[in-house]
Design a protein with these regions (language model features):
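Core of compact, soluble alpha-helical bundle domains
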Residues: 25-155
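Signal peptide cleavage region of secreted peptide precursors
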Residues: 21-23
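Positively charged n-region of N-terminal signal peptides that target proteins for export
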Residues: 1-4
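Bacterial N-terminal signal peptides
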Residues: 9-19
Length: 155
């Protein structure tokens, strides 16, 4: 388990450093499976049902994580789960259309630090591991989500 978390952390660190250093490369270096099937990542996550289950687990972890739980104490968690499911569905190449606020607006008043953001990513990785999502699919999803950090980290 520790090795898996360490590997995931290393992969995320690489993904995030790519986002910081070469954002264009991170966005143009499409995963191999996406070239043949734009919905391959969506399918790897179990489509809408799998993403819904993943977001249920993930949001529950966020709410229970003492490092960041205070950021969610006044949040409608069911609404958050729905919004995140729609967003990840769209990001993964699924048929959903995320219609929530953009990331800058959604996080403007939250005071999210880099440490808060890293805790959130760790919770997402743990939820993906618990659902046995293949490591390569996890990395692809994290690579697609990584550019959002610029709008989420506000302090």
């Amino acid at each position: 388990m520790k090795k898996s978390i360490a590997l995931a952390a290393a992969a995320l660190s690489t993904t995030l450093s790519m986002a910081f250093v070469t954002p264009a490369m991170a966005q143009t270096a499409a995963p191999a499976m996406a070239a043949s099937d734009p919905a391959a990542l969506y399918k790897a996550f179990g489509e809408k049902t799998g993403l819904t289950q993943l977001m249920d687990d993930f949001v529950n972890r966020l709410a229970a994580d003492p490092r960041i739980a205070d950021k969610f104490k006044n949040t409608n968690l069911e609404h958050l789960k729905h919004q995140l499911t729609e967003q990840l569905c769209q990001v993964a190449g699924g048929p959903c259309q995320y219609q929530g606020p953009d990331m800058a607006a959604a996080h403007a008043d939250m005071g999210v630090s880099k440490g808060n953001f890293n805790a959130l990513v760790e919770d997402l990785q743990k939820a993906m591991d618990a659902r046995s999502i293949p490591f390569s699919a996890q990395n692809q999803m994290l690579a697609r989500l990584a550019p959002m950090h610029r709008d989420i980290i506000t302090k």
